[in-house]
Amino acid sequence: MKLINIGFGNIVSANRLVAIVSPESAPIKRIIQEARDRGMLIDATYGRRTRAVIITDSDHIILSAVQPETVAHRLNTKEQDGNETDEDSVTQ
């Protein structure tokens, strides 16, 4: 299982991520409010400004204080590390 640090020691399963988006647009604000109403919102900002909204395959919405680009970079780094590990295990 691949895990991604989304800030302040909070970690999310990379396999469950559907999208990482900015919270600025009206549709995303609406998604956040709907998730809050349904009890499916996870606020991992520790009171700081929300900079990334993470949408999971279970319809949970996670708020993060880390930039979407940073989360995506961490995800890509994990995937590259995983690919190298997979290749190494095949050749051994």
From Swiss-Prot:
Region (Disordered): 73-92
Matches recorded under InterPro entries: RemA-like
Compositional bias per record (Acidic residues), positions renumbered to this chain: 82-92
PANTHER family hit by this protein: REGULATORY PROTEIN SSL2874-RELATED, REGULATORY PROTEIN TM_1690-RELATED
Family listed: Belongs to the RemA family.
Full protein name: Putative regulatory protein Ccel_1792
